[in-house]
A protein has these predicted regions:
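Noncatalytic modules at the cell exterior or secretory-pathway interfaces
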Residues: 12-17, 53-66
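Glycan-processing catalytic domains of CAZymes
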Residues: 96-387
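Heptad-repeat coiled-coil amphipathic alpha-helices that mediate oligomerization/assembly
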Residues: 80-101, 382, 386-393
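Short beta-strand segments within Ig-like beta-sandwich modules, predominantly Fibronectin type-III
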Residues: 39-45
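Short proline/glycine-enriched turn/loop motifs at strand-loop junctions of beta-rich domains
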Residues: 11, 20-25
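Exposed low-complexity, polar/acidic, P/S/T/G-rich flexible segments that act as propeptides
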Residues: 68-80
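Short, surface-exposed beta-strand/strand-loop-strand elements in extracellular ectodomains
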Residues: 23-38
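Short Trp-Ser/Thr-centered turn/loop motifs at beta-strand boundaries
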Residues: 3, 7, 37, 71-74
Length: 394
């Protein structure tokens, strides 16, 4: 077999084939981060024999192998035994359904990264501080002006690529949905007080996703749909609108394209079965999280029946005194994605639309990082004992 290692970035969920002069062939599967996984022979699994060759110049840029033995490199399988591209893509998609970077029983630090790319700021970079969490990272969010992706921005491309290289499992691009009110009847009370009330139609949302995927094909691995209904009470009729939106996204980008929704609260039982991958279902103060009011629980019984990897809790106003209680609560609620910050939320006269103090304008303080990494990786108790021991010795 050829010697050497693959290097460079590849389109997420693509297939890479390397043909060698001596007849050896490498067939590799690229995961959602653009990294190569173990050897997978799709010729056996899918009987795929028609490949799209990218040419030698591209081959040398993408792979680092003994060049004398490489004859060609292929990426993305466009056909199988003369069959249609669509059919082969369907088969690959079926296989990809079970390939997820989020493993049952594991925990992930999934930060709310609404701040602008600033990788060039060195030690003062908010992103650099965030990416210091390394392999503990789960989902990261790219947010350009609340989801304006029409034009390419090199800073966003570089920042997203750096996040994936640092250890983030998936990079999703922010698009606001504003609770689906844009397509409600004009007289519907849910539209009252909503800025740009007619803006966020399904067509507008899908166009923003399309631009994000076009401009950042390797980095845009999913969408973060903000301001999504929870399905309770008067919001229940809008669930069908969201189901339609999810289906359109799936039809366009496949199962491997991550759909993350932010409801900010627990969701109605009817919404749990909807085709999203992750729901940010808590976004409140630590005090509220710890109280877990039975009248408005953090997680409903129906939600608790689902895999932990579907849920994402965001807790702000966390302190050194209540941090341990907060992570204990997260463990008891069996949530896989967690963002804990000592940032504060202070709502202004315009409520949630324009808060006076935004808990996401900066990363958490430095004391949060070692505790969170320890919790994610399952050794927080040992970490706390070591810290206590060191304190006694001083």
């Amino acid at each position: 077999m050829p010697t050497g290692k693959f290097s460079g970035r590849f389109p997420a969920w693509s297939v890479v084939q390397v043909d060698c002069l001596d007849g050896d062939t490498f067939v590799k599967f690229v995961d959602g981060t653009g990294r190569l996984t173990g050897q997978v022979d799709y010729r056996e699994k899918l009987d795929a024999r028609v490949w799209c060759h990218v040419g030698m110049a591209e081959a040398y840029r993408l792979v680092a192998l003994d060049a004398s033995r490489v004859t060609d490199v292929s990426m993305d399988v466009p056909g199988a035994n003369g069959g249609s591209t669509k059919e082969l893509e369907r088969q690959i998609d079926l296989l990809a359904r079970d390939v997820s970077p989020f493993v049952k029983g594991h925990r992930y630090y999934s930060p709310v990264t609404y701040f602008w790319p600033d990788y060039y700021n060195g030690a003062t970079s908010k992103w650099n501080r965030t990416l210091g969490y390394g392999s503990s990272l789960g989902v990261v969010i790219m947010n350009r002006n609340s989801g304006d992706w029409e034009t390419f921005d090199a800073d966003f491309q570089k920042q997203a690529a750096r996040a994936l290289s640092a250890g983030a499992k998936r990079c999703v691009f922010y698009v606001k949905t504003q609770y689906g009110v844009a397509e409600l009847p004009k007289e519907d009370p849910a539209r009252t007080g909503v800025p740009d009330v007619d803006k966020y139609t399904q067509d507008y949302i899908l166009q923003q996703i399309a631009w994000a995927k076009k401009n950042y094909p390797n980095e845009c691995q999913g969408v973060f749909l903000d301001e999504v209904v929870n399905g309770w009470g008067a919001q229940a009729p809008r669930l069908d609108w969201y189901r339609q939106l999810f289906k359109k996204i799936r039809d366009l980008y496949g199962k491997q394209f991550l759909i993350v929704v932010n409801t900010g609260s627990n969701i109605a039982d009817d919404f749990v079965s909807a085709d999203f991958d992750i729901c940010m279902c808590f976004e409140e103060k630590a005090e509220t999280y710890l109280k877990n009011d039975a009248a408005k629980p953090v997680m409903t019984d129906r939600m608790m029946q689902e895999p932990a990897t579907r849920w994402w809790h965001v807790i702000h106003d966390v302190t050194k005194d209540n941090y341990q209680k907060v992570v204990n609560q997260a463990a008891s609620l069996d949530v896989a994605h967690l963002y804990i910050t000592d940032g504060q939320l202070v709502k202004g006269e315009d409520g949630q639309w324009k808060p006076e103090v935004n808990p996401y304008q900066n990363p958490p303080s430095e004391w949060v990082m070692p505790l969170t990494i320890a919790w994610v990786n399952g050794y927080l108790d040992i970490f706390n004992r070591v810290i206590a021991l060191e304190a006694k010795q001083k």
